[in-house]
Regions:
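Bacterial Sec-dependent N-terminal signal peptides
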Residues: 1-24
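Conserved functional acidic sites
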Residues: 22-216
């Protein structure tokens, strides 16, 4: 089992801009076809920043951040991309240095359908929408990958001794293995306020995302 925790208020601030009186993020505010996102990384600043407290009227000052590297992410139409035919329900594609992620964006959320030629068995919720302070929502468990592996590689990956042990001596080699990966994600908009960066000050929501991955 793997658990990942993320705080995403930086991403939301840069995607939505300073446009909120009371902060509500809908599908018209997040990325669309033709958008370009610039993702700057600071590799030199000491880890003196804190995520602060939960609640309303919070203030985060990250104005001392400096750009060490810059990544450019393009949001394009799935039509005409390498894996277009594998994602008939996708209406948005993210090109991150050639890595293509396919999404379906609706008024209730942004759903990830797969990455490259890895098509998810079920779409995974990437962002719930609309986002408002106090939102708590759970997605899953979602079966992301459910496939069978066969061939000579399997014999190398699973030694005969392991097969004998797992089968109580009924078999001495594996000819097929099933791989299943499931994700459960908890979303919580637990803070709201202003965020200051070298680009300016923005009204933001802070989205906490906890993802638990199980594989068998």
């Amino acid at each position: 089992m793997m658990i990942k925790k993320q705080l995403l208020f930086l991403v939301l601030a840069l995607l939505t801009g300073n446009i909120f009186a009371q902060i509500t993020i809908t599908d018209t505010d997040v990325f669309s076809i033709g958008d370009i996102a610039y993702q700057a990384n600071d590799a030199n600043t000491p880890f003196s920043f804190t995520v602060g407290s939960t609640g309303l009227n919070q203030s985060w000052d990250f104005s001392s951040l400096q750009e060490s590297s810059l990544n450019t992410i393009f949001f394009i139409s799935p039509i005409g991309t390498n894996y277009e035919n594998q994602y008939p329900d996708a209406n948005l594609c993210m090109d991150d240095n050639g890595l293509l992620s396919y999404f379906n964006k609706t008024s209730t959320g942004v759903f990830l359908h797969g990455v490259g030629d890895t098509v998810f068995s079920s779409p995974a919720l990437f962002y719930p929408l609309p986002l408002t302070y106090g939102l708590n929502i759970s997605d899953g468990p979602i079966v992301v990958i459910d496939t069978a592996i066969t061939g000579p590689f399997l014999s190398l990956a699973i030694p005969a001794a392991t097969v004998v042990s797992l089968s109580n001596g009924l078999a001495n080699r594996a000819d097929t293995a099933r791989v299943q990966i499931t994700n459960t994600t908890e979303f919580s908009v637990d803070a709201s306020g202003t965020l200051t960066t070298p680009l300016g000050t923005f009204d933001v929501l802070r989205l906490k995302r906890v993802q638990t991955t199980n594989s068998v």
